[in-house]
Regions:
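Structural signal for interior beta-strand "rungs" in well-ordered beta-sheet cores
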Residues: 38, 95-305
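Terminal amphipathic alpha-helical/low-complexity segments used for targeting or macromolecular assembly
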Residues: 1-99, 160, 165, 171-172, ...
Length: 345
């Protein structure tokens, strides 16, 4: 593809050789003379001057460099679109593999691809163009809209409801029993039935080995456009809003509430029954044990305001030095007081 064609498809301003052929996309340090790269983070701006890439996707006001530039707002999103032009994932034609087990009562929309050893239980309803790769299991009564894409070994449990264009990655489990137990009179833990399904909105992505547990009563809800990273745990009865990001190893205890457009960075944890407002940001490894108002960024464990946390961390790093200074001051004060006592005597 010529650069001029790529610029037209992206709606970018091209500065450089319009006839240059490009064959793919790569990171800024790895890109070669026929590949496109991007700069979205200012820390990588210097690398744009030395890159071997054919062209660099940059912001409109980016300084001139020797490589051709494609100038566009949000170069990172433009990079994503460019990847889609050059990388085509495997295609899965409609059809049912002979080893698949499909209950006669299941209703499957047109254009579905049902892979090897897929199991579809009674009463399942799938919209058009579902793709179920090998060993996917759909429990009785689950429902999904159009364009469900379930990768190998994904599981959706009984009664769960999925919207349109939902993607379930390898090993993810939607609707497993929540962690609910009560002690009986003998002091033994007894399982509490987990009767409530999971509901995923449109365009939800649940990545590899993540778990969204079913509710004790009611339902566990994930809003439209929310993305759930690998190894995330969403506890029973939790509610997550729309267009929220739950990054790797985030854990939500039961009945957590997370608003729209929130970002929970890696390994952040939220205690049960806490509410996080719209637009909240939890930085990596934050531990939240209380409600967080909309728009707040918090850090640390226990989590508190990010700006205060940064100051506290800076102070924490100085504690050994400050302890030595305090020790010296205490010794000087003690010596001064001893001398004063002698004079008074």
């Amino acid at each position: 593809m010529k650069l001029i064609e790529l610029a037209a498809r992206l709606g970018a301003e091209l500065r450089g050789d319009a006839e240059l052929e490009v064959t793919g996309v790569q990171g800024i340090e790895e890109a070669g003379p026929t590949e496109v790269t991007f700069v979205a983070n200012p820390r990588y701006a210097a690398l744009a001057r030395t890159t071997k890439a054919a062209a660099v996707l940059v912001e409109p006001d980016f300084p001139e460099i020797s490589a051709a530039t494609l100038r566009i707002r949000n170069p990172y999103h433009a990079f994503s679109r460019t990847l889609g032009l050059f990388y085509q994932p495997p295609a899965y034609p409609p059809g049912v593999h002979p080893t698949a087990m499909i209950d006669p009562s299941a209703v499957i929309g047109e254009g579905a691809h049902i892979g090897a050893y897929v199991v579809i239980g009674p009463g399942v309803r799938l919209g058009m163009r579902a793709t179920l790769l090998p060993h996917v299991v759909l429990y009785p009564g689950m429902q999904a809209g159009s364009h469900l894409f379930a990768h190998a070994h994904a599981v959706v449990r009984e009664g769960c409801v999925l919207g349109d264009h939902v993607t379930i990655e390898n090993g993810a489990i939607i609707g497993a029993d929540g962690f609910g137990f009560s002690k009986n009179e003998a002091g033994q833990w007894e399982k509490i039935p987990q009767s409530g399904p999971v509901r995923l909105g449109d365009r939800v992505d649940v990545q590899a080995n993540a778990c969204v547990d079913r509710a004790t009563v009611g339902q566990t809800e994930i809003g439209a456009g929310t993305k759930i990273d690998n190894l995330v745990q969403v506890g029973h009865g939790s509610r997550v809003g729309s267009d929220t990001l739950l990054c790797a190893q985030v854990g939500l205890a039961g009945s957590s509430v997370v608003g729209d457009r929130a970002i929970l960075a890696g390994q952040a944890g939220v205690a049960g029954h806490c509410t996080l407002g719209d637009g909240v940001i939890l930085t990596a490894q934050s531990g939240v044990s209380h409600d967080v108002p909309a728009g707040k960024m918090v850090s640390g464990s226990p989590a508190f305001d990010n700006r205060l946390w940064l100051r506290a961390v800076a102070l924490f790093q100085r504690l050994p030095e400050l302890a030595k200074r305090l020790d010296r001051l205490e010794k000087r004060l003690a010596a001064s007081e001893a001398a004063s006592d002698k004079e008074q005597a």
